[in-house]
């Protein structure tokens, strides 16, 4: 079990302790770290929905350090980001790869950032299936549809032509923070909080 630091606050009614992530959630900060999978996605979606209900006018800040993960889990986060009223500002710290990069680019325009030593990696969806030939064919068609849809959305969020996205995601493509800005995945590199 991972150790989660506690924060103790003094109030007029005494002391109150929070785990660090709950305290940061009060500041509208959500962390997306590790593999994108269903449990993580459900927690992130729930936090976004809670913050929207609490104040639909204030931005939400999503900090990403992820190697990517399950497409359907990531798409639930993506759809929620697009659906809710508050802007979701995205920050890459460490790495945003695969679905992590996709969600980084999906932040509100002008509010997508990388820290200076972050790296971003884009590529096509990964998948594997075994079974009868007909079932393999069905799954192959489905992953090609998912690939086409993700490329369309990546083109929309980066401003890159679809053909460029299709070419660049054919294999793993790594970008430094400044390269991610040039590509349109993020809007700027932040070296210090202002």
UniProtKB/Swiss-Prot annotation:
Keywords: Cytoplasm, Hydrolase, Protease, Serine protease. The active site is at 98 (nucleophile), 123. GO terms for molecular function: ATP-dependent peptidase activity; ATPase binding; serine-type endopeptidase activity. One of its GO terms (cellular component) is endopeptidase Clp complex. It is found in: Cytoplasm. PROSITE patterns: CLP_PROTEASE_HIS, CLP_PROTEASE_SER. Cleaves peptides in various proteins in a process that requires ATP hydrolysis. Has a chymotrypsin-like activity. Plays a major role in the degradation of misfolded proteins. PANTHER family: ATP-DEPENDENT CLP PROTEASE PROTEOLYTIC SUBUNIT. Belongs to the peptidase S14 family. This is ATP-dependent Clp protease proteolytic subunit. The gene is clpP.
């Amino acid at each position: 079990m991972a150790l989660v630091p506690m924060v103790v606050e003094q109030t007029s009614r005494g002391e109150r302790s929070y785990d660090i992530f709950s305290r940061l959630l009060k500041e509208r900060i959500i962390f997306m770290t590790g593999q994108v999978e269903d449990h993580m996605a459900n927690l992130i979606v729930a936090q976004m929905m809670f913050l929207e209900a609490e104040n639909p006018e204030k931005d939400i800040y999503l900090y990403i350090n992820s190697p990517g993960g399950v497409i359907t889990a990531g798409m639930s986060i993506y759809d929620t980001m697009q659906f809710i009223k508050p802007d979701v500002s995205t920050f890459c710290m460490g790495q945003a790869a695969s679905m992590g990069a996709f969600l980084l680019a999906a932040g509100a325009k002008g509010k997508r950032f990388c820290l200076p030593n972050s790296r971003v990696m884009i590529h096509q969806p990964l998948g594997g299936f075994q079974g009868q030939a007909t079932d393999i064919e069905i799954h192959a068609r489905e992953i090609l549809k998912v690939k086409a849809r993700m490329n369309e959305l990546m083109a929309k969020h980066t401003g890159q032509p679809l053909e460029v996205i299709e070419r660049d995601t054919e294999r793993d493509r790594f970008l430094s923070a400044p390269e991610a800005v040039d590509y349109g995945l993020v809007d700027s590199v932040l070296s210090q909080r202002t």
